[in-house]
Amino acid sequence: MRYLDFKRFSIYYDPYLIIFITLLSIIGLFFLYSASDGNSSVLIKQSIFVFFGLILMIVLSQPDPQIYYSYSGFFLLISVILVFIAIFFGPEINGAKRWISFGFVSLQPSELCKIFLPLFIASYLYGAKLPINLKNTFLTICLIFVVFFIVSSQPDLGTGIVILLSGLYVLFLAGLSWTFIGTSLAIFIISLPFLWNNFLEPFQRQRIATLFNPDLDPFGSAWNITQSKIAIGSGGILGKGFGEGTQSHLNFLPETETDFIFAVIAEEFGLVGLTILMGLYFFIFIRCFYLSINARDRFCRLVIGGLSLVFISTLFINIGMVIGLLPVVGMPLPLISQGGSSLISFYIAFGIIISMASHKKLVPR
């Protein structure tokens, strides 16, 4: 059932997505409470974000897709302006200026860019002939890299990479030719030495180097990954139990509430807990994939496909980072890690997805 009809209005929703997103969010609170050593203030704050985020998701699923099509450029522009405000006027935390402080809460506007950039690109490419022509491809790639470089300059390479992928996903789904993809990949590989020496910050280069050789800095940049691997491996099949993780609760594992909460889950709930968690993520992605291929027009297919790939990419980047396959770039575990901006951004994304999937009216060309 996609919507409920009343005399004056209809409520649009997707019961499967809503149920499993809510379930994952509630389980996430359970995991976060353990990762924070039973810190009730962390739990209460995150619970507030979850509550209002779920309401926001339902609210954003009600507008017709035409609204998102028409105002996608405005949404992206506001997001980029907020990023500039964070860069020039935001507080500096750990050497980065990524947030806008409102006193009791902070906003990380780059999280909005990863949602509204693919939305705008989908609206721009909607109606283009397949395969999309060189002009549309060039303009789209320019926009993607402009937003990528703006966000990465904060510096925030992790979110920048997701933003880069979010735009490229929509471009690929819109019919980007394999020849262009292969050529671009070759150019990227050739330019790696230049990017290494001129684009990456020293600490970012150090993280990549220690990924391949932890002995270069075992008590510095390699410490996080080493402790994370120990935590994951020690969890075994059933885990050590709720609140019993030694790596996390004895302060060997850093950032337990944010970047490395996946390792905490593995240590305390073992392979069984991870299987249940990944099952929830898998179902949400498969449901979004189903909604994408059954969407009623090309714009909706591009949006649902692009946003669902952003969701699953964030998941795999976080897991890859935690298990030592990718460098540490500061990537939250979707719908679970502490942080209101990331949480709310995904609720916005799912609200848009449900809107695209549940409305019968086609977006006019």
Feature locations, PLM:
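N-terminal membrane topogenic signal
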Residues: 2-21
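Hydrophobic alpha-helical transmembrane segments of multi-pass inner membrane proteins, especially
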Residues: 18-26, 30-224, 263-323, 348-352
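Glycine/serine-rich anion-binding loops at beta->alpha junctions
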Residues: 103-113, 153-155, 236-240, 331-346
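TM-adjacent membrane-interface loops and short helices in multi-pass inner/ER membrane proteins
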Residues: 210, 214-258, 269-273
